[in-house]
Amino acid sequence: MFRPAAREVVKLPVRYFSCKSEPTRAAPVTKKTSREEIAGLIPAFPEIYPDFLQSPVWNRRNALKEELERQDMLERRMNIDIPEFYVGSIVAVTSSDKNLGSKEHRFVGICIRREKEGLLHQFTLRNTIENIGVEVVYDLYNPTIKKIETLKLEKRLDNDLSYLVDALPEYSTFDFHMEPQAHPAGTPIPVNECKVKLKTPPWTRRWEVASVRGIEDTWTQATPWFKRKLHKTIVNDYEKYDLIADYRTSSTKEQEVFVQKQMQKFEKERHAAGLTRRRILKSAAAYK
């Protein structure tokens, strides 16, 4: 019986690669943790602490400058209790004044603006006294401020209530002896959806073309001359869709988390040293 000759097996040289020949396995997909799920952090941090945000001007952001300012701001907050308040909240500020007999002055009004960052942060209170609108601008970290009280904690439809200058006086009139209203802990901050009525023109700004929600029927009250001029007015209503501009002018989530952790560390160090028991990072809506 014929049998075929056995074939000789020739071993070829094997090339050893520096990497594994088998394909790498894909990394497991991790669920993104939202700010609400991060333990101890406040979801509404940009609204409660706008003074700790980065500058909206990209070229003015300096990490070292922001770090030094935050240290001074935290030390100042250890000496004075700065409560939570928003644009639209009714706030009372007691400041020292050497020219008065009592050596201090107390002003009550609605917060219409919060602007600037860091140690330069300012907020404006407005009230009507004897049918005259009075606005007082306070530096939040001014050492002459002795006490800040939130008499009524609430929000408005807009983040800037400058249109109260042209509104009827009844929308910015508050009693100086107003009693503070307690806000239940853990409940959302109420939003006052009141829409103000403006005085007859002329106004300080063209509110009929401004993107504000807190004014009632500005087009009807506008003068015919401005209505005819509307087709020549440049309205940049497309800016709200510009994602790149919003990214450059707003603070990132990573920066907010970093600042909050730094504030928590500062609190723990002061509490461990027994210097104070005051809390800096707090929120009426997130507290349980």
Curated annotation (Swiss-Prot):
Identification of the protein by name: Large ribosomal subunit protein bL19m
SUPFAM superfamilies tied to this protein: Translation proteins SH3-like domain
GO BP term, example: translation
A GO cellular component entry from the record: mitochondrial large ribosomal subunit
UniProt entry keywords in alphabetical sequence: Mitochondrion, Ribonucleoprotein, Ribosomal protein, Transit peptide
Family from the record: Belongs to the bacterial ribosomal protein bL19 family.
Keyword Secreted attributed: no
Record-level Gene Ontology MF annotations: structural constituent of ribosome
Classification via Pfam families: Ribosomal_L19
InterPro entries hit by this protein: Ribosomal_bL19 (IPR001857), Ribosomal_bL19_sf (IPR038657), Translation_prot_SH3-like_sf (IPR008991)
Encoding gene, per UniProt annotation: mrpl-19
Gene3D superfamilies: 2.30.30.790
PANTHER family: LARGE RIBOSOMAL SUBUNIT PROTEIN BL19M (PTHR15680:SF9), RIBOSOMAL PROTEIN L19 (PTHR15680)
Entry annotated with the keyword Mitochondrion: yes
Species this chain originates from: Caenorhabditis elegans
Compartments where located: Mitochondrion
